[in-house]
Every structure is written in C-alpha cells, then in structure tokens.
Amino acid sequence: MNRTNKLILGAVVLGSTLLAGCSSNAKIDQLSSDVQTLSAKVDQLSNDVNAMRSDVQAAKDDAARANQRLDNKVFRICK
C-alpha cells in the first residue's frame, strides 16, 4: 500500500473508532436517562403505596367499628 492509501485507511479506522465512541456515549446517556425515569416512577409508586396504607388502615378501623356495632346489636337481641 502506498502512503496515501495508508493515510486514508488510518483516517477511516480513526473515524470509525470515534463514531463508535460517540455511539457508546449516546447509549450511556440514554441508559442514564432511563434509570432516572425509572427512579422517579419508583418514588411515585412508593408514595402511592404509603398513601394507600393509611387508606387501608382507615378501612380496617371502620370495619372493626361496624363489626363491634353488629356484635352489640346481636348481644342486645339475644338478652
């Protein structure tokens, strides 16, 4: 190979390497963005679960009070 062909081949190899590096950086940036998005979704789901816990506890308390009222009525009827 003459000198010109070697320079062209070297430039092509260097260019390909640089493009591959840019592609990897773009993929890393995309993955980083995806991780941030997923982290935000996990935080939102965690907040939703915590909000539901208080709702579930309130429902349990209401059910317990209703059961107690029913038990009291049954006890009075059976007397």
Swiss-Prot record:
<keyword id="KW-0964">Secreted</keyword>
<comment type="function">
    <text>A highly abundant outer membrane lipoprotein that controls the distance between the inner and outer membranes. The only protein known to be covalently linked to the peptidoglycan network (PGN). Also non-covalently binds the PGN. The link between the cell outer membrane and PGN contributes to maintenance of the structural and functional integrity of the cell envelope, and maintains the correct distance between the PGN and the outer membrane.</text>
</comment>
<feature type="lipid moiety-binding region" description="N-palmitoyl cysteine">
    <location>
        <position position="22"/>
    </location>
</feature>
<keyword id="KW-0175">Coiled coil</keyword>
<feature type="lipid moiety-binding region" description="S-diacylglycerol cysteine">
    <location>
        <position position="22"/>
    </location>
</feature>
<feature type="repeat">
    <location>
        <begin position="25"/>
        <end position="35"/>
    </location>
</feature>
<keyword id="KW-0677">Repeat</keyword>
<keyword id="KW-0472">Membrane</keyword>
<comment type="similarity">
    <text>Belongs to the Lpp family.</text>
</comment>
<keyword id="KW-0572">Peptidoglycan-anchor</keyword>
<keyword id="KW-0134">Cell wall</keyword>
<feature type="modified residue" description="N6-murein peptidoglycan lysine">
    <location>
        <position position="79"/>
    </location>
</feature>
<dbReference type="InterPro" id="IPR016367">
    <property type="entry name" value="MOM_Lpp"/>
</dbReference>
<feature type="coiled-coil region">
    <location>
        <begin position="28"/>
        <end position="69"/>
    </location>
</feature>
<dbReference type="GO" id="GO:0042834">
    <property type="term" value="F:peptidoglycan binding"/>
</dbReference>
<feature type="repeat">
    <location>
        <begin position="39"/>
        <end position="49"/>
    </location>
</feature>
<feature type="signal peptide">
    <location>
        <begin position="1"/>
        <end position="21"/>
    </location>
</feature>
<keyword id="KW-0449">Lipoprotein</keyword>
<dbReference type="GO" id="GO:0005576">
    <property type="term" value="C:extracellular region"/>
</dbReference>
<dbReference type="Pfam" id="PF04728">
    <property type="entry name" value="LPP"/>
</dbReference>
<keyword id="KW-0564">Palmitate</keyword>
<protein>
    <recommendedName>
        <fullName>Major outer membrane lipoprotein Lpp 2</fullName>
    </recommendedName>
</protein>
<dbReference type="GO" id="GO:0043580">
    <property type="term" value="P:periplasmic space organization"/>
</dbReference>
<keyword id="KW-0998">Cell outer membrane</keyword>
<keyword id="KW-0732">Signal</keyword>
<dbReference type="GO" id="GO:0009279">
    <property type="term" value="C:cell outer membrane"/>
</dbReference>
<dbReference type="GO" id="GO:0030258">
    <property type="term" value="P:lipid modification"/>
</dbReference>
<dbReference type="GO" id="GO:0008289">
    <property type="term" value="F:lipid binding"/>
</dbReference>
<dbReference type="InterPro" id="IPR006817">
    <property type="entry name" value="Lipoprotein_leucine-zipper_dom"/>
</dbReference>
<comment type="subunit">
    <text>Homotrimer.</text>
</comment>
